[in-house]
Design a protein with these regions (language model features):
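A solvent-exposed interaction/effector surface
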Residues: 2-170
Length: 170
């Protein structure tokens, strides 16, 4: 009986400790949703079509990060048109930075939508909500506010602990 009580106490302490760590990393922070009355930033970047293990994907992100270093304040943005289910499935992704003008070898992506839903997500990457969870929250927000989404999502990497998900509204 005494061993059972000690085991239960140890489990309680471990569970409480785990929860406190999870909370400290930002696991309980809510996703902040708002409607922005402006177009998403114009992006300069490139579209990649291939598999996640393709060297071209890594090279694309290296190229964009190199361009980003030349433009302080520019943030990495990604748009996944086709998300892979596995390592060998095809994906189509646009990677770019918020530049209002083109750069050599980069395509300019401008958005015609005049509004978008902004989801601000903060916390450690290990405890952030999944992309599916964020998309569900955005869709629920759009439905509650009688908004029609354009059907794609722009991920803006603000920092290692903050991501903005932009969902243009028709």
């Amino acid at each position: 009986m005494k061993k059972l009580l000690i085991a239960a106490l140890v489990m309680l302490i471990l569970g409480l400790g785990g929860y406190l760590i999870y909370d400290q990393l930002g696991g309980n922070r809510p996703v902040e949703l708002s409607l922005e009355a402006k177009s998403p930033d114009t992006l300069s970047g490139q579209t990649f079509r291939g598999t996640p293990v393709d060297k071209g994907l890594e090279q694309l992100f290296q190229k964009i990060q190199t361009t980003q270093k030349l433009h302080p304040g520019a943030k990495l943005h990604t748009i996944y048109y086709t998300e892979p289910a596995g390592k060998l499935d095809t994906l189509e992704v646009f990677a770019g930075i918020n530049l209002p003008f083109g750069a050599p070898d980069l395509e300019l992506k401008e958005f015609s939508e005049g509004r978008y839903i902004l989801a601000k997500v903060t916390g450690n990457k290990w405890v952030m909500p999944s992309p599916e969870t964020i998309k569900e929250k955005i869709q629920d927000y759009a439905k509650a506010n009688k908004l029609t989404l354009s059907g794609y999502y722009i991920d803006k990497i603000v920092s290692e602990t903050e991501v903005h998900v932009i969902a243009p509204v028709r």
